[in-house]
Amino acid sequence: MKVRASVRKMCQHCFIIKRRNVIRVVCRVTPKHKQRQG
């Protein structure tokens, strides 16, 4: 998982989740696209 200051969708399969005020990007097709803001 990458930790970044700004997260964005890297492909059309990525989707954004907000959990406990932490924004995450999850991708079922390419797990390499997982990101967390922080």
Swiss-Prot record:
Record-linked Pfam families: Ribosomal_L36
Listed InterPro entries: Ribosomal_bL36, Ribosomal_bL36_sp
Gene Ontology MF: a single term: structural constituent of ribosome
GO BP: any one term: translation
Superkingdom of this protein's organism: Bacteria
Record key words, sorted: Ribonucleoprotein, Ribosomal protein
Record's GO cellular component terms: cytoplasm; ribonucleoprotein complex; ribosome
HAMAP family (UniProt xref): Ribosomal_bL36
Similarity remark: Belongs to the bacterial ribosomal protein bL36 family.
Annotated protein name in UniProt: Large ribosomal subunit protein bL36
Native organism: Blochmanniella floridana
Organism classification: Bacteria, Pseudomonadati, Pseudomonadota, Gammaproteobacteria, Enterobacterales
Gene from which this protein is expressed: rpmJ
